[in-house]
């Protein structure tokens, strides 16, 4: 079975991205310093900053004790338990009673006392490694499993190499370890993965909260005060365990999406469950009930995923030819792959995938009008603008291009927005169920943005700037699908809209990030301005559907 690379190898893959981020920061500081004073002393300061940047890069690249950005964050300690979350509106379930959870044993029963003693036996022989494991998982179940999902996406975001005859092999979910390994987690695949996992986690936790208040069984440390408590304490009932619920639902969804990584996924699941018992947060029956609940909810989402038409998104030669012919029939120049040999377009039928936030007719209505005609003056002007941006690029613009590139080997643009959201959610001390609700709103927006975006790309099948003007040398890789509309812009518009609703104080910052992500594609020579501006608008229109759901889901 496939195993993820070791942590230091993972960070080695991410090092160029980290350097780009740091370079971007240095450039911002440089600009500020030059604006204040242009003299030799200031130049020395700038040189010093650059030396520091190089030194830090060297330390990162050589250290064998590299830590993740969130490895040392405090334990989740919610400012509110959201005790009434069992009444919140689920995504797929009709209500929490769709899943039955058995009545727990009483806390004074011999069975429960034996489970308390199991915790004590573990705590009597704790190792340093076990303490660290508890600390890691105490940061939050939704956060950690989102990070695991992002890592899996990055691992599998590698396009297959061509066959000897010039054709391209297709990953096979039924034989995931054969080359090319399944999946190729490109942006639309990734957006769908984030959407399904987050929505399923949310429904599972809403159901868990319903049964927590129904049975109201206290946490073990509330029953036996002699237990060592290694996590933040709470008045929230512990049955079923919210962490185990997230384990159960996440494992089943990830097994569907990443079938070749089941050994790694199960390893993380066992580690997570053990951490909750060792920490004194849950007895074993809390864990077992939670995991079973999570798995039951996951099966509802697995059934939906198997029928959402994503399996046909790759299309076939007949469909690919039809898209070209329809474009030429309109008098336009169809998109062509720039790879040698030509690679089929990336998931051209993804626009037919079943969305979460609206129906298929609404999806069609969200598709924007056509791009500028290839022979129009507007297109000539926009093409020239792309060329001028590339040949007159600056270090700052180049850093922006790389910061937002999110290409091969990364967790894709949707994963980048998940990371942005997670960093902000950590500071908010949300409960697990509110974490799940907010991530579901974000990731359903990103998934549905991908659907509308890809429907638009296939509808117009417009060429990339580099196809119309080979003199344009892009600053990052050219994606293998049509230009209009920009995927980065659409994802970013959707993310900024819903995140700005969730955290209004950050709305202007999210919009600024979305604008920068969008413009990065123009700076890099990958998109015309109309691809970017229209993509942002479409994304925000999609995000507004998530906002409509948010104001009616009972959580506000």
Sequence positions of predicted segments:
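Positively charged n-region of N-terminal signal peptides that target proteins for export
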Residues: 42-45
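C-terminal motif of bacterial Sec signal peptides marking the signal peptidase cleavage site
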Residues: 58-61
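Acidic/polar surface patches and capping/hinge elements
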Residues: 63-556
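Ala/Thr-enriched low-complexity intrinsically disordered regions
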Residues: 2, 7-12, 23
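Hydrophobic helical h-region of N-terminal Sec-dependent signal peptides
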Residues: 51-56
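Cationic, low-complexity basic patches in intrinsically disordered or flexible, solvent-exposed regions
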Residues: 14-15, 32-33
């Amino acid at each position: 079975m496939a195993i993820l690379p070791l942590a230091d190898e993972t960070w080695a893959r991410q090092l160029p991205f980290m350097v780009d981020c740091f370079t971007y920061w240095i450039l911002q500081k440089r600009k500020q310093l030059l604006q204040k004073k242009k003299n030799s002393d200031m130049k020395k300061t700038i040189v010093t900053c650059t030396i520091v940047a190089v030194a830090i890069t060297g330390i990162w690249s050589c250290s064998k004790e590299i830590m993740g950005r969130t490895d040392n964050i405090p334990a989740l300690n919610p400012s509110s338990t959201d005790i009434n979350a069992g009444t919140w509106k689920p995504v797929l379930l009709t209500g929490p009673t769709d899943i039955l959870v058995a009545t727990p044993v009483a806390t004074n029963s011999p069975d429960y006392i034996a489970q308390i003693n199991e915790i004590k036996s573990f705590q009597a022989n704790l190792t340093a490694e076990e303490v660290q494991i508890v600390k890691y998982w105490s940061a939050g179940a939704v956060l950690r499993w989102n990070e695991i999902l992002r890592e899996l996406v990055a691992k599998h975001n590698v396009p297959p190499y061509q066959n000897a005859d010039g054709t391209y092999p297709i990953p096979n979910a039924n034989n995931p370890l054969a080359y090319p390994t399944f999946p190729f987690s490109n942006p639309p695949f990734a957006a769908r993965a984030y959407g399904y996992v987050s929505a399923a986690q949310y429904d599972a936790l809403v159901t868990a909260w319903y049964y927590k208040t129904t049975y109201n069984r206290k946490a073990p440390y509330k029953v036996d005060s002699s237990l060592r408590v290694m996590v933040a304490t709470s008045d929230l009932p512990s049955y079923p365990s919210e962490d185990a619920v997230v384990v159960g639902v996440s494992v089943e969804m990830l097994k569907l999406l990443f079938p070749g990584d089941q050994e790694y996924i199960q390893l993380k699941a066992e580690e997570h469950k053990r951490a909750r018992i060792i920490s004194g947060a849950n007895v074993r029956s809390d864990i077992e009930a939670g995991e079973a609940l999570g798995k039951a909810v996951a099966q509802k989402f697995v059934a939906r995923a198997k029928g959402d038409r994503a399996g046909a998104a790759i299309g076939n030669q007949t469909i690919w030819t039809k898209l070209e012919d329809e474009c030429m029939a309109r008098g336009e120049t169809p998109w062509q792959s720039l790879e040698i040999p030509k690679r089929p377009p990336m998931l051209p039928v993804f626009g037919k995938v079943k969305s979460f936030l609206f129906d298929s007719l609404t999806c069609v209505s969200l598709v924007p009008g056509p791009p500028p005609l290839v022979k129009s003056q507007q297109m000539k002007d926009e093409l020239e603008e792309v060329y001028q941006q590339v040949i007159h690029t600056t270090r700052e613009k180049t850093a922006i291009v790389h910061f937002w590139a999110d290409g091969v080997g990364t967790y894709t643009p949707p994963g980048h927005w998940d990371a942005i959201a997670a960093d902000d959610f950590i500071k908010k001390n949300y409960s697990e169920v509110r974490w799940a609700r907010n991530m579901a709103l974000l990731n359903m927006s990103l998934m549905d943005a991908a659907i509308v975006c890809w429907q638009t790309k296939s509808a117009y099948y417009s060429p990339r700037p580099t196809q119309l003007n080979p003199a344009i040398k892009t600053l990052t890789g050219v994606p293998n699908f049509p230009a209009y509309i920009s995927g980065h812009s659409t994802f970013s518009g959707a993310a900024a809209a819903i995140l700005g609703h969730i955290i209004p104080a950050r709305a202007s910052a999210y919009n600024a990030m979305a604008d920068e992500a969008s413009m990065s594609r123009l700076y890099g020579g990958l998109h015309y301005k109309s691809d970017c501006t229209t993509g942002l608008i479409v994304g925000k229109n999609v995000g507004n559907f998530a906002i409509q759901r948010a104001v009616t889901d009972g959580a506000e």
